[in-house]
Amino acid sequence: MIRRHIWWILLIACLALGLLWPRLGHRDQVIPVPCQDIVAGCALSPAGLRVRFDRQPDALQRFKVYVELPNVPEVHASFNMRGMEMGFNRYRLLTDGAGRWQGEVMLPACIQGRKDWLMMVEADGVRYEIPFNSR
């Protein structure tokens, strides 16, 4: 009887570990990218990253994001603010096959009226954090 209880405990422990493993595993590396003018473009030379917008973004208005990042299979972009999650807004950017990625995106509305945004560009297990301001 005790042996049976031990097997159940081990089974439950294995299931719990399986469910928690993704949260315990490796965290994506976050690299800050300094950016003065997101429309002119911002770059991080060692990674080969360059990011720019087609215009100064405004909440709930579509704009284009352009990312240059060679040798990665996928690029995703999302938008948040420091200390404030802005809901699910993750975009998969499309490539031209030469390390250039683009997508049409939209900033969520901030009910506090803040304009200080963080764009997260995710590629190949690395997250690049790019600060910018909206109108």
Name each model feature, range by range:
Residues 97-106:
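Aromatic sugar-binding surface patches on proteins
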Residues 46-96:
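Extracytoplasmic/periplasmic/luminal assembly and interaction segments
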Residues 49, 89-91, 101, 126-130:
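Short beta-strand segments
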Residues 72, 98, 112-116:
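Extracellular Ig-like/FN3 beta-sandwich strand-entry sites
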Residues 109-132:
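Short, exposed beta-strand-loop hairpins at the edges of beta-sheets
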Residues 18-20, 129-134:
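Glycine/proline-rich low-complexity segments that form flexible loops, beta-turns, and polyproline
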Residues 4-23:
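Hydrophobic membrane-insertion alpha-helices, especially the h-region
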Residues 19-61:
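Transition segment at domain starts
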